[in-house]
Swiss-Prot record:
Entry coiled-coil feature ranges: none
GO molecular function terms attached to this record: RNA binding
Residues that hold RNA according to the record: 38, 41, 118, 237, 266
Compartment list: Virion; Host cytoplasm
Residues that bear N-acetylmethionine: 1
Domains: entry comment: The N-terminus is involved in homooligomerization.
Protein name: Nucleoprotein
Length: 314
């Protein structure tokens, strides 16, 4: 069995390869974006499979291209790749990489399946660098329209929970005045709203996910599992968290528009939820409690309450 240290070391090795590729080939990745225009797993086993498949190849490069697919076209893109691309060069590149690694759209009955989502979660720092590198040259596949705010997209991608440190695996999950509290709160809301919009109605009924309360509870359970993963050391989580929020920081503090965005999230999203959902959120994190308590006020009042509560260390 692969040890946790071996898993962490292998992730760091491949991360270094991929980040190096990003720094040296950003233009190529952005071009590739244009050319393709139109959760519980065994990390050790998946890494072993990838390492074997990557023999004789530049896996850093391949990983970058796979993650570009993930964040510009979505996880379903790997199905019938050639039919979904308007530029031949992009079709050839994408098809060759997807086929070589055997990337599939969903796990299905294969516990060891390689999916774009699993790759994104396994190498979260690479994912973050991909999103930051191609965001100016592509429309990224993220829908935040139901949050009632804007400007927080980089914090809402599926790799971010890998950077979160929980204070407890039982509610409240985050009660410190730090960045993890903010990120967990954002992802609980984004995850529930995304599930509400994208999950077929028939499946929602079958799984009893027909109310905001049900969706939040479902999302929280999955999010806690994801945040509890030990693929990254706590030090790495902290380092990557700080890198993630750099665009929102100025002179050791968060910028004014960051607090404004959180205030709008409170008044534009939480205010619309029913009382049972609001009460559930109040017990998940201290930031969500503040947002619920101030959702009936103005954007500025909600933003001030959140800013006054939080500190700006980690």
């Amino acid at each position: 069995m692969t040890s946790m240290v071996e898993i962490q070391n292998e992730i760091e090795r491949v991360t270094a390869l991929a980040v190096k590729y990003i720094s040296e080939n950003k233009d190529s990745l952005v071009v590739f974006v244009g050319q393709i225009d139109y959760n519980g797993y065994d990390a050790g086993k998946l890494l072993s499979i990838l390492k074997e498949k990557a023999k004789g190849r530049d896996f850093g490069r391949d990983l970058c291209y796979l993650l570009v697919m993930r964040y510009t076209r979505g996880t379903g893109f790997v199905r019938d790749v050639r039919k979904k691309i308007k530029v031949a060069a992009g079709a050839d590149t994408a098809y060759e990489i997807v086929t070589h690694y055997g990337v599939v759209q969903s796990v299905g009955d294969n516990a060891d399946a390689i999916t774009l989502g699993r790759l994104a979660a396994l190498f979260p720092y690479v994912s973050m660098n991909i999103v930051k590198s191609v965001s100016t040259g592509a429309k990224l596949a993220l829908d935040t329209s139901d949050l009632g705010t804007s400007g927080l997209d980089i914090l809402l991608w599926d790799f971010v929970p890998q950077f979160i440190n929980l204070d407890s695996v039982d509610a409240p999950y985050c009660n410190k005045k730090n960045t993890s509290n903010i990120l967990f709160s954002l992802h609980l809301l984004q995850g529930a709203l995304t599930t509400r919009k994208t999950m077929p109605d028939q499946k929602k009924k079958k799984d009893n996910l027909t109310t905001d309360f049900d969706l939040l509870k479902y999302t929280a359970e999955l999010l806690v599992i994801t945040c509890s993963a030990k693929n990254l050391t706590d030090n790495k989580k902290s380092t990557y968290r700080k890198k993630l929020v750099e665009p929102f920081r100025e002179n050791e503090d968060y910028k004014a528009d960051f607090w404004t965005a959180l205030g709008k999230l409170s008044t534009g999203c939480l205010k619309k939820m029913k009382k049972d959902a609001q009460n559930y959120l109040k017990d998940r994190t201290t930031v969500l409690k503040l947002m619920v308590d101030n959702c009936s006020g103005t954007d500025d009042e909600a933003a001030k309450a959140i800013k006054d509560y939080l500190t700006v260390d980690d």
